[in-house]
Amino acid sequence: AATELFRITKKTKYLKAARKRAHNLNSRLTAQGWFVSDNAERPFYHGVEAGLPIIALVDYLAIERNRNIKEKTKRTIKVSLDNQIALNTQVTNPFNLARQTFVSEKDGQASKIQESFFTPHDENVMWQGENARLASLTAAAIYGGKISHKDPQGAFGINPELASFAQSQIDWLMGKNPYQISMLYGFGVNNPPHARSAGTMS
């Protein structure tokens, strides 16, 4: 919000606010390449907006003119995206599906840091599918990659490895998955059946 407010008003107070938030995000990146969440031990993961930290930093870079701050922010983007690619290649992953670092909780006790596919839901009331998370990571890979992994000749203008990652998430959504189901309602084949409780989708 601070980035957009500065973009519209050009008021210095919003640039300062955007810088503060960018500094906070840059400071939350660990040496391993994941972002610290609400305490010093829990990695950031999200059922919908897994790519938001990178997307927000890319947007912020468009208004920042301080060279040192820009370089630090670009480094954050690069390290985070490099970590995502490394995470994906640590295990057999025929669909190149995005993996993540997370901590689960049971009976008030946090687990050790884990790496896996899909968002863990534990036993709480949260329910969230993976589709938005994968789309968010695709956006982060493409927008962030144009800054940190640029390749003018590559797909999406980014290097082949990151482009393959981005495309693989969309491929999964469109039906290149073990279920051969297109997750985008009305497109592809074998769409999940329409649930009356979902209301009108057409």
Whereabouts are the PLM-identified features?
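Glycan-recognition and catalytic cores of secretory/periplasmic carbohydrate-active enzymes
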Residues: 1-202
